């Protein structure tokens, strides 16, 4: 679902993008999606940092389950 918002932008940038027929709404939407994805990944990493450290310690002590299948 889309939501209408109002943003304030630099006039020169707006005019240039408009002159090149850039879909400004699409550009803003894509930029917002990318930032939301980055923020979710950052939050996930913070929430799971302890678990990832525990897995790293386990692998350090016991090796990886894939070690026996490595050919390199």
UniProtKB/Swiss-Prot annotation:
The keyword Iron does not apply. Keywords: DNA-binding, Plasmid, Repressor, Toxin-antitoxin system, Transcription, Transcription regulation. One of its GO terms (molecular function) is toxin sequestering activity. It comes from the Bacteria. Residues 41-72 are annotated as: Interaction with CcdB. This is Antitoxin CcdA. It comes from Escherichia coli (strain K12). Residues 3-40 are annotated as: Interaction with DNA. It holds the Pfam family CcdA. Belongs to the CcdA antitoxin family. The keyword Cell membrane does not apply. Degraded by the Lon protease. InterPro entries: Post-segregation_anti-tox_CcdA. Changing residue 70 to K: Increased protein stability. Homodimer in solution and when bound to DNA. Three CcdA homodimers bind to the promoter region and contact each other via Val-22. Forms a complex with toxin CcdB; there are both high- and low-affinity binding sites for CcdA such that both CcdA-CcdB(2) and CcdA(2)CcdB(2) complexes can form. The CcdA-CcdB(2) trimer is sufficient for rejuvenation, whereas maximal operon repression occurs with CcdA(2)CcdB(2). When the CcdA:CcdB ratio is lower than 1, a CcdA(2)-CcdB(4) complex is formed which is devoid of repression activity. In this case repression is alleviated and both proteins are produced. GO terms for cellular component: toxin-antitoxin complex; transcription repressor complex. GO terms for biological process: negative regulation of DNA-templated transcription; protein-containing complex disassembly. Antitoxin component of a type II toxin-antitoxin (TA) system which inhibits the post-segregational killing (PSK) of plasmid-free cells, also referred to as a plasmid addiction system. Labile antitoxin with a half-life of about 1 hour in the presence of CcdB. Binds to and blocks the activity of CcdB; will also remove bound CcdB protein from the CcdB-GyrA complex by forming a CcdA-CcdB complex, a process termed rejuvenation. The N-terminal 36 residues are not required for rejuventation. Functions as a transcriptional corepressor for the ccdAB operon, repression also requires CcdB. Residues 1-36 are annotated as: Not required for antitoxin activity, or rejuvenation. Disruption phenotype: Leads to cell death and induction of the SOS pathway. Additional disruption of ccdB reverses this effect, i.e. no cell death nor induction of the SOS response. The double disruption leads to increased plasmid loss.
């Amino acid at each position: 679902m889309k939501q209408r918002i109002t943003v304030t932008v630099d006039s020169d940038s707006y005019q240039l993008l408009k002159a090149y027929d850039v879909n400004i709404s699409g550009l803003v939407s894509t930029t917002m999606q990318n930032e939301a994805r980055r923020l979710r990944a950052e939050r996930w990493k913070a929430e799971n940092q302890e678990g990832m450290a525990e897995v790293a310690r386990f692998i350090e002590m016991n090796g990886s389950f894939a070690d026996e299948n490595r050919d390199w």
